């Protein structure tokens, strides 16, 4: 007969977390253990009825053992238990049920370093509070509860586990799409086909604009090279003239509650109508479909989160403690006009994050997106205007870096929010100092030489998955992407072999093909710089591992470059290039000190199963975000506020509780109550006595 083993499965907690992280409609697994127990018995019943099949039932649950014994009758089957567990349980079962069916022991075989994580995982699962073994050994557990049929426990889903959309108490989680379901992918492909062959017209939106001063550009798909739109860039002279004066829009006079309602309306619209943005994320920005879906979710989260945070900040005044007879009130007011300069690598999420923060707090906004993604910026601006944001409150300027430089000189600015390179941030800071009498607020989020430290206790399979995602998702074109993998020498070669092996199976090509993993570099200039860097490294004698070839002067294959020291790195390489170096056991703090000397401080990854070691690294590393035993990309709004220090940025973290404070001025009104006729509060106290 054919042998078939039935198990209840593992990593249930991972599946629950995964559905919450990706905003799925529901869960791919049961949320109540009783549902799993019933399904197990249903499968067991089916297996027992099949001829020429020898079922092997792996379980440590006495009720399941008894139920299968009852269902099995004279059928030929086996029980299985895990090596080192369940011995007393099965001895008890034999004494009650007899020795009609044999019990085999499932004993995994392998090297110690591979087996230990597996065995620990099994012990943790079987030792969980909900497990039968744990309840059996608990003297306070009622024996009737242990014997109760799981059928009586399945009336409803677990109330302890909220649906993915409701995991945040004070706001909705953005809806995602389960891309592991082929039906979802097929439906999405059909929807996106509706935009093929259509072209968009993208142009600036601001008062007194003269279309005659614009230069036309044809935008082509990064995925297939077809025309996707006509884009009009205005001259620096016309921009300088248009923004030489400023009149506040009606938006600045609205209540924070009204503004929040409008922004949440925009969030709902984008969440329910994502396909056009998805299409141009793929074709204009070269995004993989998974990254595109994640980006739209992040934009929706920004809109909802900043709406709620603005209400907390501005809806009520704050009465401060002080001496009797005096009233001190703190309030927050809009700064004025903000210039928001957003990048091409997150043309939806970061653009919407910047402008929604400024708008939520009552400011007027000039949006200056990257010259590489003007169509997406135009679509977003139109959505904001159609859903209730006045054109005077949100103006759009399309153009290259010179147009952005011109805008930074505008005397009407009260603040600038920027995401991009460190060099550009320095230029903006210098321009603000040179061209403004007052000190203009500058919020900058820049790049980083992001590292990941891996010690010998790490689970290398998980390390490999997290390295691939961190270094090569979005073709490495994220400011949070992994640039340097620092591995303890004891496992160094194993890590390189596993990561290089994983790189080999990555598919490179147009992102309109959902089967591809790595998409294009944003421009041919960027491609040339990355290719030159790799070639120079090879000429200099560094070991370069590159399983794939360059394609069409736009696709850089995932690349490993081995280095000896962090001092060999001078700046960030914005693409799928991963540097790898080793360190000696016992020198982790020395590694952290070397990382701190880089003066970048954005993200840091740590892979270790020694919790005290991870905590010590997090305490001593000068970085904004530390990720332990996971990838280092994909920060979630309100959950992992994102931003760095040093060369990696200024100010408070985006998507965090302090971010909006940068968009407001504080005012304190101190009132001497005695001067208005006496301190009635104090006098009333005297009367009570």
Please provide the spans of the model-predicted regions.
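Positively charged, amphipathic and often flexible ligand-engagement surfaces
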Residues: 1-175
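Generic beta-strand/beta-sheet core signal
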Residues: 5-7, 56-60, 80-82, 106-108, ...
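Conserved C-terminal structural/oligomerization subdomain of aldehyde/semialdehyde dehydrogenase
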Residues: 54, 74-79, 120-139, 143, ...
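Structural signal for hydrophobic packing residues in well-ordered secondary-structure cores
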Residues: 127, 247-250, 267-274, 278, ...
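Short, structured beta/alpha segment
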Residues: 129, 134-283, 305, 554, ...
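N-terminal Rossmann NAD(P)-binding subdomain characteristic of aldehyde/semialdehyde dehydrogenases
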Residues: 251, 257, 261-351, 355, ...
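ALDH superfamily catalytic-core signature
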Residues: 386-388, 415, 423-564, 586-589, ...
């Amino acid at each position: 007969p054919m042998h078939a083993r039935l198990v209840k499965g593992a990593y249930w907690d991972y599946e629950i977390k995964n559905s919450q992280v990706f905003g799925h409609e529901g869960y791919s697994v049961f949320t109540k253990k009783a549902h799993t127990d019933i399904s197990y018995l249903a499968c067991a019943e089916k297996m027992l009825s099949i001829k020429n099949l020898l079922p092997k039932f792996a379980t440590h649950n006495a009720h399941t053992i008894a139920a299968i014994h009852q269902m099995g009758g004279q059928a030929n089957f086996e029980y299985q238990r895990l090596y080192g567990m369940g011995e007393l349980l099965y001895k008890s079962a034999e004494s009650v049920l007899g020795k009609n069916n044999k019990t085999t022991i499932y004993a995994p075989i392998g090297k110690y370093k591979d087996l230990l994580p597996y065995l620990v995982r099994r012990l943790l699962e079987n030792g969980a509070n909900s497990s039968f073994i744990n309840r059996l050994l608990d003297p306070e557990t009622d024996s009737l509860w242990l014997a109760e049929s799981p059928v009586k426990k399945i009336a409803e889903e677990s109330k302890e586990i909220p649906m993915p959309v409701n995991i945040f108490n004070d706001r909705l989680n953005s809806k995602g799409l389960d891309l592991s379901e082929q039906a979802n992918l097929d439906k999405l492909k059909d929807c996106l086909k509706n935009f093929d062959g259509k072209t968009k017209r993208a142009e600036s939106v601001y008062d007194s604009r003269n279309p005659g001063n614009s230069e036309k550009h044809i935008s082509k798909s990064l995925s297939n090279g077809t025309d996707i739109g006509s884009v009009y860039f205005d001259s620096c002279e016309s921009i300088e003239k248009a923004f030489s004066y400023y009149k506040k829009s009606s938006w600045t006079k609205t209540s924070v509650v009204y503004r929040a309602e409008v922004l949440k309306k925009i969030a709902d619209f984008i969440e329910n109508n994502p396909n056009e943005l998805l299409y141009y994320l793929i074709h204009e920005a070269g995004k993989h479909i998974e990254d595109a879906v994640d980006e739209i979710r992040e934009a929706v989260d920004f809109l909802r989160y900043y709406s709620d945070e603005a209400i907390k900040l501005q809806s009520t005044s704050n009465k401060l403690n002080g001496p009797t007879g005096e009233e001190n009130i703190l309030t927050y007011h809009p700064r004025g006009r903000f210039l928001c300069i957003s990048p091409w690598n997150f043309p939806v999420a970061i653009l919407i994050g910047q402008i929604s923060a400024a708008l939520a707090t009552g400011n007027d906004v000039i949006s200056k997106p990257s010259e590489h993604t003007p169509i997406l910026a135009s679509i977003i601006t139109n959505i904001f205007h159609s859903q209730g944001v006045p054109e005077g409150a949100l103006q759009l300027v399309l153009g290259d870096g010179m147009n952005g430089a011109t805008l930074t000189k505008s005397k009407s600015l009260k603040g600038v929010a920027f995401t991009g390179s460190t060099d550009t941030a320095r230029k903006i800071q210098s321009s603000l100092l040179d061209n403004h009498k007052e000190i203009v607020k500058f919020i900058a989020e820049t790049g980083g030489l992001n590292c990941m430290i891996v010690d010998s206790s790490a689970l290398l399979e998980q390390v490999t998955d997290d390295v691939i995602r961190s270094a090569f998702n979005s073709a490495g074109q994220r400011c949070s992407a992994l640039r340097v993998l620092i591995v303890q020498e004891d496992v160094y070669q194993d890590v390189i072999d596993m990561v290089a092996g994983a790189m080999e199976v990555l598919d490179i090509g147009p992102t309109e093909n959902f089967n591809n993993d790595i998409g294009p570099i944003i421009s041919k200039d960027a491609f040339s710089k990355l290719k030159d860097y790799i070639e120079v490294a090879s000429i200099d004698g560094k070991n370069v591992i590159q399983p794939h070839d360059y394609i069409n002067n736009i696709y850089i294959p995932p690349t490993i470059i081995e280095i000896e020291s962090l001092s060999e790195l001078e700046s960030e390489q914005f693409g799928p290039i991963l540097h790898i170096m080793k360190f000696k056991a016992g020198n982790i703090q020395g590694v952290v000190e070397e990382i701190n000397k880089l003066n970048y401080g954005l993200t840091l990854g740590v892979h270790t199963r020694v919790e005290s070691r991870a905590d010590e690294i997090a305490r001593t590393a000068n970085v904004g975000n530390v990720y332990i035993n996971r990838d280092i990309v994909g920060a979630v709004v309100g959950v992992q506020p994102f931003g760095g220090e040093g060369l990696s940025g200024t100010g408070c973290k985006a998507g965090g509780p302090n971010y909006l404070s940068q968009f407001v001025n504080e005012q304190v009104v101190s009132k001497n109550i005695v001067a208005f006729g006496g301190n009635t509060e104090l006098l009333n106290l005297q009367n009570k006595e």
